[in-house]
């Protein structure tokens, strides 16, 4: 799950086709959980520097269920889409934060995406 999400979020940042995976179609459906108009506000609330990736912990939004976890993935993907170039961004911190927030729901996410763990 971690590798899939890393590849997906990096792909959303620059659309590098070498990162593309058919599973991304399923993950892109999560975009509906975050309004495009909210992305600028979310970025502002993250107080990001030019080299930051999505810093979800700065949003102070708890992850209490699978829907919250899906929303965090969608926020990460949409913010990644709208921020600087991949090579300039410190992704490791962003992924550490994201996974710490949603790892409890990895099994549920796998079932939701694939129908099994």
Curated annotation (Swiss-Prot):
Is Cell membrane given among the entry's keywords? no
Q: Where is the signal peptide?
A: none
Q: What superkingdom does the record give?
A: Viruses
Its function, per the record, reads:
Bcl-2-like protein which contributes to virulence by preventing host NF-kappa-B activation in response to pro-inflammatory stimuli such as TNF-alpha or IL1B.
Can you tell me which family this protein belongs to?
A: Belongs to the poxviridae OPG035 family.
The gene for this chain is: OPG035
- The entry's protein name is Protein OPG035
Q: Which organism is it from?
A: Vaccinia virus (strain Copenhagen)
Q: Name one GO biological process term.
A: symbiont-mediated perturbation of host apoptosis
Conditions for induction: Expressed in the early phase of the viral replicative cycle.
Q: Which Pfam families match?
A: Poxv_Bcl-2-like
Which keywords does this Swiss-Prot/TrEMBL entry list?
A: Early protein, Host-virus interaction, Inhibition of host NF-kappa-B by virus, Modulation of host cell apoptosis by virus, Viral immunoevasion
The reply on keyword Cytoplasm is no
């Amino acid at each position: 799950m971690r590798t899939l999400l890393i590849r997906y979020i990096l792909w959303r940042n620059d659309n590098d086709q070498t990162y593309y995976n058919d599973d991304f179609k399923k993950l892109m459906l999560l975009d509906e959980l975050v309004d495009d108009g909210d992305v600028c506000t979310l970025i502002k609330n993250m107080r990001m520097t030019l080299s930051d990736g999505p810093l979800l912990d700065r949003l102070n939004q708890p992850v209490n269920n699978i829907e919250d976890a899906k929303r965090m993935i969608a926020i990460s993907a949409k913010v990644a889409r709208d921020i600087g170039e991949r090579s300039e961004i410190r992704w490791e911190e962003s992924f550490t934060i994201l996974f710490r927030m949603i790892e409890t729901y990895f099994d549920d996410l796998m079932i939701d995406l694939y129908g099994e763990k």
